């Protein structure tokens, strides 16, 4: 609730995306959203009148840090390498479940996966695939929320927003205007 207020989410319809080690999208609502599929959850806001509906993922920035360590590159180098690869990574896909999955699929046993790996894939492909994999996980969260409320624009906060490339990938994949 405090993070939501700090991000400027004060009125119904206000939404924010927090992109750090973990990530989430939270949207202020007049009343809690009851998702029969239990993909989302609600937290009462500080005003005691509204709540925010959340969708979360465990390993956003954690995935970026993990692949950076594996490849021995800094964030600037990761961004440069990823920018050299076309969207779609020539078929390389990353599922960002290093610490299980939360929304919209709650599965503590889920694990991270690189799929479609072949000999054409270089470091840049793996870097971009991580950015895209996190973006598609956030799209699943955004799409689940869109079933209950309009979601077109979010206040974007967190260390991940320092990457212009990653921010743009997230905006493109989720179809969200990031502010």
Description of each model-found segment:
Residues 1-179:
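Active-site core segments that coordinate phosphate-bearing ligands/cofactors
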């Amino acid at each position: 609730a405090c993070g939501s207020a700090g991000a400027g989410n004060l009125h119904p319809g206000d939404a924010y995306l927090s992109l750090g080690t973990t990530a989430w999208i939270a949207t202020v609502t007049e009343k809690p959203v009851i998702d029969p599929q239990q993909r989302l959850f609600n937290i009462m806001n500080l005003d005691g009148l509204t709540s925010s509906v959340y969708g979360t993922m465990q390993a956003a920035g954690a995935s970026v840090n993990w692949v950076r360590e594996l490849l021995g590159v800094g964030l600037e180098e990761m961004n440069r390498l990823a920018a050299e690869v076309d969207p779609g990574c020539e078929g390389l896909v990353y599922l960002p479940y290093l610490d299980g999955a939360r929304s919209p699929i709650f599965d503590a046993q889920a694990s991270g996966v690189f799929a479609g790996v072949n000999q054409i894939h270089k470091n840049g492909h793996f870097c971009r695939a991580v950015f895209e994999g996190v973006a598609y996980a956030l799209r699943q969260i955004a799409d689940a929320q869109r079933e209950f409320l309009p979601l077109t624009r979010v206040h974007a906060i967190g260390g991940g927003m320092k990457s212009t490339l990653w921010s743009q990938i997230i905006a493109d994949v989720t179809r969200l205007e990031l502010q």
